Amino acid sequence: VTVNTLVKQDELSSVREALDAICRAGADAVIVQDLGVAAMVRRDFPSLALHASTQMALCNASGADFARRFGFSRVVLARECSLDDIRAAVQTGVEIEVFAHGALCSAVSGRCLMSSMAGGRSGNRGRCAQPCRQAFRLDDRRGALLSLRDLCLWDDLPALCGAGVRSLKIEGRLKSAEYVAVVASAYRRALDAIAAGTFRPGDSAMREELLQIFNRGGFTRGHVMGAQDAALCAMERVGHEGVALGKVLRVKGGFAAVRLERALADGDSLQIRGSQDLDMRYSGHSVEAGGTATLRLRPDMRVCEGDSVARLSDALQLERARAHAPKPISVSMRARFEAGAPMRLFISDGQSVAEASGPSVERAQTRQATPEDARRQLEKLGDTPFLLARPEDLSIDMQDGLFLPVSALNALRRQAVERLAEARISAFAARAGETPARGPEFAGPLADGSDVPSGSPIGAQTLAVVFSDAALADGLKARGANLLIYEPRFFTPEALEADLASLPGGIWLRLPPQLTERALGDALAVVARHEKTLGGLLLESAGQLALPLTLPVIAGEGVPITNREGLRALTRTRALGFTLWPEWTKSEQRAIMPFELPCLLTMYGRQTLMLLNHCPKRAVDGLSGGRGGCGLCTNGRMACG
């Protein structure tokens, strides 16, 4: 069950109640982003396994190891991980889950404040308004410049399996049941074929199935398989692209003749794309690919010769998908009505039995009820998961001359159905087995405090300044800044080495929130060479909290601390301070006082709204490789507006 939102202090009691209900319902695990919620689960609900949400932005082996030590049994890695990063994370021993199909966030996982700052709807609270699907301008180009294609790793499943991935995640939020059926079935069949040694990548029919159910400008293989920039983006259309069906040959008398590239069936949903997009549903005989179909146009539709036609939904595909819908559960019912005794109804699914009782049955003063009257009310199971497959599955034992109110019969039926559902759930919970073995409690380097610096650099008069021009360091210090935090513009080993060599002593270094395992290793090697002159490190990912460091560290905004549970969890790490979460109001920040660690509050400067792992400028220019020698970001104005 997903519980992967950041939680305010005054919401903790409600979250605890929700976790209790989740636990009692027999759930196996919860997916969590908030460190405070994770700590609460470990302490109060040890039977629930902890899965780290992709919103935690864990992107390398160090991040996976942090999660393992905290007590997470599975990590849903950030979508920006490469296959090499995935392999390295698997080696930590924690189960690894990766996104394999569906919508992608434009921003780095868990590092988007755009929706929150632009419209008050936080993506970290499950309320993203998807501003990245809106139109932006860059130079002379306007369009959905931040919108990404949907991910599809169907062909790459053997590589993921070979890397040791334990679970695949399909992004299906707000999608139809048919979408879930088609995509889940495709990946299930592929995994079974891989296990049997019969999988064949490049299956055009399977790709057609996936494209038809939903795609944005086709698919991307994502960061996992090295897609860059233009290979990630879908700038022309943010909704369903559909599949190309054909082109309009001629228009006459309210009809359009279309030459078909694909077969067309009655009930297919189409979109004619010319000067505007026009939606319609085809009604008529099926037409094979290569044939000509006649479309009846509405009076308001302006269609021209040469307009393209896309099929948005395939009626036959949807019909096949609906066959995957859960089948109703066959039940039997037995009712007993006796004057002066309570109404009674028994219902059974063959394993569980439930009983409902109603008011005492009275003698009829006028019209008496018949067994058929009772049957009509008791067999109404249409909006429930249950089914009376045969008439004889409902037996009624009743005396003559009784009065049976319709409302009482309906209430009796509803009560019986609810109790059977509860009995089935209880049986599931009982079968859930023993409490899962708890992982090791997170201890972190504080288990032995001998190498942990004492005292925090943050005090009542601390003025911290983050800067990216090494030449400014002395001037900032002269003007009263007493905590200087350097944020390199380029985080290559060579650039970082040169920057740190030119900085005065005592400067702190801000680590990027997203570093591949290799880049992280290179950076830490440079940091180690300058350890005696650096003041400390500002960490921008929860996964960095467990790095093997001896320098002092402060948790930045990339380690969201939004409640006192999270703050207490942070005190068990090396952090000597933290940064207040920028989405919270003053009253929400005060709610976690008194702070158990010194804190920083951002007072001035441009708030980073989105951290991107691709370049919109390169995407606009159609570039999808060769980043090594690119200098676009150092030339001119590169901001989208």
Specify the residue positions occupied by each region the protein language model found.
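Conserved nucleotide-cofactor-binding alpha/beta core module
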Residues: 61-62
